[in-house]
């Protein structure tokens, strides 16, 4: 009976995972492009929409590289087409409209992940050019209403490229944006190395280390840094002001672990493996309180300050594997 329950849960979860992205091209291959022109796919090709990439780059698309790599590649081909039709990769498209929803530029993660795993059935050079476009700051040539531009091409990307970090007095959610940019830039660096673009590989490898800028050893948290190079004060790791503070749908407790591309570097910042493990343990035993007048409702499923109910925490339990105590991951 227990095995049947586990099986039922697994396949129910798998069904839910495959609900989106969804088919957007008709039976004859016609679809509405990101430029709102009627287009037609190549014969046998399908065009997809509803890429909620802030959600799906973490687990869905890596799962598809294992279970259905060709489907994942077809979705990447749709993303490449969207970048050509609309001028830039979407962060989250809806029926061939840019929404500008959430942060990061995670289409590049899909491309790098698939390419690294040997899936080559897409034009990687087109995908790479689109990745460089997404990581820079250029508001021209994007086919969306003018009021949408700051969401599709946020000013945070300007600061990252111009001064090397996102000042918390210049942009909201600065820490979260910068940490996700560092990961995405690491993905771009991988592609650059693969394609022989040494100059950009070095440039984006340097950007990928940008997470170090935000770590405050005196508190043990990633913190907002203003344009004068000073930590934001006052600081409260339990505080949350939904979509209006230095983090995105989370607080300093949850976001201080978002360095998925360099866990060894994060351990070094936190004082080595033993201190890292103790610090990680403290996340799960901390007081689960949240403070503030506009606490993010997305911070949910709390075990201590680990928020299993929302995306920024989803990778954290796996960090024990990198710290040499994999049984802690299994226990959790």
Q: What label would you give each PLM region?
A:
Residues 52-56, 62-75, 82-88, 101-104, ...:
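Structured, non-membrane catalytic/scaffold regions adjacent to prosthetic-group chemistry
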Residues 17-25, 42, 83, 87, ...:
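Structural motif corresponding to the C-terminal cap of alpha-helices
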Residues 39-50, 89-107:
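Aromatic/His-enriched, Gly/Pro-containing loop or helix-boundary segments
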Residues 28-43, 69-94, 288-295:
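Active-site-surrounding "flap" and adjacent substrate/cofactor-binding loops of secreted or lumenal enzymes
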């Amino acid at each position: 009976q227990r095995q049947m329950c586990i099986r039922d849960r697994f396949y129910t979860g798998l069904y839910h995972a495959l609900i989106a992205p969804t088919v957007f091209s008709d039976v004859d291959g016609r679809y509405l492009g990101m430029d709102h022109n009627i287009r037609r796919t190549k014969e046998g090709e399908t065009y997809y929409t509803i890429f909620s990439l802030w959600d799906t780059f973490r687990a869905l698309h890596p799962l598809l590289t294992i279970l259905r790599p060709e489907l994942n590649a077809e979705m990447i081909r749709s993303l490449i087409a969207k970048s050509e039709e609309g001028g830039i990769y979407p962060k989250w498209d809806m029926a061939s409209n840019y929404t500008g929803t959430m942060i990061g530029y995670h289409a590049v993660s899909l491309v790098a992940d698939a390419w690294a795993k040997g899936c080559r059935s897409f034009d990687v050079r087109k995908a790479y050019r689109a990745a460089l476009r997404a990581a820079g700051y250029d508001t021209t040539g994007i086919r969306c209403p003018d009021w949408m531009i700051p969401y599709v091409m946020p000013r945070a990307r300007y600061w990252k490229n111009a001064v090397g970090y996102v000042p918390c007095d210049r942009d909201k959610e600065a820490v979260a944006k910068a940490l996700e940019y560092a990961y995405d830039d690491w993905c771009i660096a991988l592609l650059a190395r693969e394609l022989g673009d040494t100059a950009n590989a070095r440039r984006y490898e340097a950007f990928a280390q940008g997470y170090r800028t935000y770590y405050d050893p005196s508190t043990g948290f990633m913190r907002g840094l203003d344009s004068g190079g000073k930590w934001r004060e006052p600081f409260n790791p339990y505080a949350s002001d939904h979509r209006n503070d230095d983090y995105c749908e989370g607080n300093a407790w949850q976001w201080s672990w978002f360095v998925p591309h360099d866990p060894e570097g994060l351990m070094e910042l936190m004082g080595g493996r033993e201190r890292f493990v103790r610090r990680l343990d403290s996340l799960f035993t901390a007081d689960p309180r949240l403070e503030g007048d506009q606490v993010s409702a997305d911070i949910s499923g709390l075990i201590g300050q680990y928020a299993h109910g929302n995306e920024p925490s989803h990778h954290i339990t796996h960090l024990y594997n990198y710290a040499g105590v994999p049984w802690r991951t299994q226990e959790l």
